[in-house]
Structure formats: structure tokens, C-alpha cells
Amino acid sequence: MARTAHIVRETSESHIDLELNLDGTGKTDIDTSVPFYNHMMTALGKHSLIDLTIHAHGDTDIDVHHTVEDTAIVFGEALKQALGDKKGIRRFADATVPLDEALAKAVVDISGRPYCVCSGEPEGYEFCMIGGHFTGSLVRHVMESIAFHAGICLHMQVLAGRDPHHIAEAEFKALARALRFAVEIDPRVDGVPSTKGAL
């Protein structure tokens, strides 16, 4: 059975059209109308091996927040949909990724219980403007939106870093690598990887 999803979300603030394939090769076609976010979501697709197509636009003349948030919401929903009954998945995964002086660690549990903990960001990171339009605070917001709408537990920890661009990119790549292994089918797993029998 194909582990894919296609979701279109239309509100007065944004239009999001997103497709993904969990069993892809990391092919991406990303246009969110927010250049730095394009860069981050392209990295997420590439390093998770999730084929990802996103065409999004919104009221970015006001602020990029709505488009960024809504894209993350739809990505989370699509991830949940594509996972289906979660039979055979590895479920747990972690990844630590460097980018020059920055180092980020992501730990994922595809548990069906949404939770997100972000820690370790340097003081003032949330106020930094990255790429001209994207604030550091949006990184945490993206992680929370993905986790809660995908129904996963995500711990994201910044272990080192000075450059806000490097920190953000390390976080997205760490999430990508953790998702790559968490969603992967393990041929040794029989059924749902839970003692309860459901996730």
C-alpha cells in the first residue's frame, strides 16, 4: 500500500497544496513564497528521503507567520495520513546533525500522542531575523505544529551554535534524519510497534 498523502488547505490567510511520499528518494518541489522556509523544507525533504511537493501562498504582505504555520500544519497532517495504521514502522529514532558551529539533536516517537519540547536555543534566538523574513521563533512554531498535527512526540535540542541560520538549518536537518528512520518499515516488526497493539 502506498504511503502517500495529498492535502489542500484553504483559509482566508493562506492556500497550501502539499503532497508527500514516505517511501521516496528525497525529491522536492517547494514554493512557500518564503525563501528561507523554502530552503528549510527542501532540506527536510532531501534528508528524510520523503518526496515532498509544496505550493503555498498567503498574506505574506502582512507577515509570513500564517503561511509558515499553515504549511507546517498541513505537513503534519499529511505525515499522519501517509503513516496510516503505522504497522511495521520503526517508530523511534533520533539524529544529531552539525552545521559548522551549530549542533542540533532531534528525537522522535511516532506514538499517536502529540508532544513537543524545544530546548537549548541561545538567548535572543527567537528574535533573530533569518533570510530577511523568517524569525527564529518560527522554528519552534514549525516544530510544534508538525508534532501536534502529525501526532508525534518530538524533542528538539540545540546543543551548540551562534549563527541563527546554521542553528535553524541543523534543527530542520536533524528532524529530517530522525523522521527518515522513524517512518521506515522494519521487516522484523510484525504489526504495530506497541505493547498496546495500537498507536
Swiss-Prot record:
This is Imidazoleglycerol-phosphate dehydratase. Belongs to the imidazoleglycerol-phosphate dehydratase family. It catalyses: D-erythro-1-(imidazol-4-yl)glycerol 3-phosphate = 3-(imidazol-4-yl)-2-oxopropyl phosphate + H2O. GO terms for biological process: L-histidine biosynthetic process. It is found in: Cytoplasm. Keywords: Amino-acid biosynthesis, Cytoplasm, Histidine biosynthesis, Lyase. InterPro entries: IGPD_sf, ImidazoleglycerolP_deHydtase, ImidazoleglycerP_deHydtase_CS, Ribosomal_Su5_D2-typ_SF. NCBIfam families: PRK00951.1-6, PRK00951.2-1, PRK00951.2-4. Its main location: cytoplasm. Gene3D superfamilies: Imidazole glycerol phosphate dehydratase, domain 1. GO terms for cellular component: cytoplasm. The keyword Ribonucleoprotein does not apply. It comes from Bifidobacterium longum (strain NCC 2705). Pathway: Amino-acid biosynthesis; L-histidine biosynthesis; L-histidine from 5-phospho-alpha-D-ribose 1-diphosphate: step 6/9. It is an enzyme of class 4 (lyase). PANTHER family: IMIDAZOLEGLYCEROL-PHOSPHATE DEHYDRATASE, IMIDAZOLEGLYCEROL-PHOSPHATE DEHYDRATASE HIS7. GO terms for molecular function: imidazoleglycerol-phosphate dehydratase activity. Its EC number is 4.2.1.19. Signal peptide: none annotated.
